[in-house]
Amino acid sequence: MSEYISPIWDIEIGSYTVQKITRFDVFSSRQAPLDLAEVELPKAGLPTDVDAGTRVRISQGYREKGMWLIFDGEIERMEPRSVTTTIFAQDQGGKLKRTPFSQTFIQIEPRAIFQHGLQKAGIMAYKLSSKPLPPKASFVAGGNCLEVFKRVNAAWGLDWAYYFEPEGEFYWGPWEESPRYLQAELTKLEYGVNILEPTRVEEGGRRGLITTFAMPWIRHSHRVIILDHRHFVDPIEVRVERCHYHHDAQKARLTLEWSRGKK
């Protein structure tokens, strides 16, 4: 499709605006509340002060459509090679992973535990569900914040995702209350139009995988419409479980895993 012919990108590493890359990949998932990015770029021109902890921002888009931020985080480590350097970065979930959280709570609701953990990690922008949940007589937090948050969901029997928007806000709550569920418009992925590789369908049509053109406006937990008569008689609405954004000199792609039938 002509509208997807010329994808563009913008990468900032600290105060340095990247001019050339070999590739970048961004991985984002409902199941792993820590977005990861890899940027491979020429050594030449990379400032010497770029190191672990340096901020990384990645945007992708099209001149005719605009740009979308798909990653905002910090460098975790760097791997120099002969002519290129690969940068590995984590989003703000890295702060939660690095922050120890050990505390005993009495008569506590899960929202309050999340608030304590976020404050310990210095996270001030967040949206937590206000849905009433029964308090536990006691809860012992131990480990880092991400580990504790996972245990909180398990202790209360919740299938609630928690993640950072690339713009910085942390979200925890039911899928149907999330900003991503409440999106204004659903993207259509159609066989013969913008589905690029054979659709993998599993579990009797409950799960699958699609590769399409770069669509940086799609994020995990969004809803999309799939039209593929090879597998489904009618269009189906699915939830995006994982996103892999890829960009190199030859192509820009989005590979997404999807599921349907649960919230």
Residue positions per predicted region:
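Juxtamembrane "anchor/assembly" segments of surface/extracellular structural proteins
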Residues: 1-49, 92, 177-263
